[in-house]
C-alpha cells in the first residue's frame, strides 16, 4: 500500500510539474506570413508545411495570409505587421535603394527563375522580342514583369519608341488581350497562361516569352524577413526556413497532394487548373538546373550582383545595394537537407 501511495504521489507530482512547465516548454511562437498573391497553385507548399506539422515541429504557430503583389508584401514586412513574406527579390532591390528603408533581406530563394513574361495570342504574330515593335503592350504599372521592361528592351535590341505601352489594371489585363485591345501583356507566366485558358483560349493559341530565357539573369520570389528581427530571433528564422523548404520538397514530390492541401483553404478553385498552374511554377521557376545541382533556397551571389546591375538599366539608383545587402544564406539548412531528388 505504501508503494502504491508513493507511486501515486510521484505520478501526481510529475503531472503537476508537467502542467506547470508545459505552457512554457511547448509554447508555439505566433508567426504571420503573407504571400504575394491569392491562395492559388504556387501557394500549396506552405499549406503542405502547415498540414504536415513542419512549422509546429519548429515551435511556430504560423498564420498564412493572401497578398496583392510583392510591393504590398514587402511593405507588410517593413511595417512589422508580418514576420515573413513571400515576395520578388527585384522589387526588394528597388525598395532597399532608399537610405531610410528597413533592412529587409531574402533568406531563402524559391523562384530561381522569375515568372516574368510577355504573353500574347498567336494571331498577333509575336514570336520573338523584336516583334513587339509596332504593337501595343498592356502592362499594369505595378507589375513585377513590367518593371523589367527597360532591361528586357536593352538586352533584346527592341526600339522602345515603337512599342505603345497601355497602362492596364490587373483584373482587365487578360480580358483586354482576348478582346484584341492590346497585342501582348506583361505578367507572371503561369498566372496569365491560366487566366487565358480559363477564358477559353486554346493552349496552342497562347505564346509565352519568358524573360529569364531572353537575357535577364534575375531571380524571382523568395522568403523575406527584417534583418533586425532575424538577428534577434535566429532560431525562429532558421526553423521557418527549414519547415518551408520541407513543404516545397514534399509538394514537388507529390503535387496532387499539395493541391489537396490548397483546396482546403480555397474550395472554389478548380483543382485541375491549380495543378497545372503549380506544375508550371515548378517546371519553369523552381526546378532549374542550378536548383537540381545545388538544392533549393540558395543563390549564386555573382549572378545576384549581375541582376542588380541589370535592374539598374531601368532604375536610377541613389543608394545601390550590394548582393550581400539583399540575400543572407546563414539561415538556410545544410545543402543535403535542401536537395531535390525529383
Model-flagged regions — what are they?
Residues 1-13:
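Bacterial N-terminal signal peptides that target proteins for export
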Residues 21-27:
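Sec/Tat signal peptide C-region and signal peptidase I cleavage site
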Residues 27-179, 183-190, 209-211, 216-217:
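Short, glycine-/small- and polar/acidic-enriched structural segments
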Residues 63, 71, 167, 209-211, ...:
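Short linear loop/turn motifs
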Residues 89-90, 99, 171-176, 181-271:
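Pocket-lining segment of extracytoplasmic ligand-binding domains
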Residues 160-164, 203-207, 268-280, 317-325:
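Short, surface-exposed acidic
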Residues 232-316:
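Secondary-structure end/capping motifs
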Residues 302-342:
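Conserved C-terminal helix/tail region of periplasmic/extracytoplasmic solute-binding proteins
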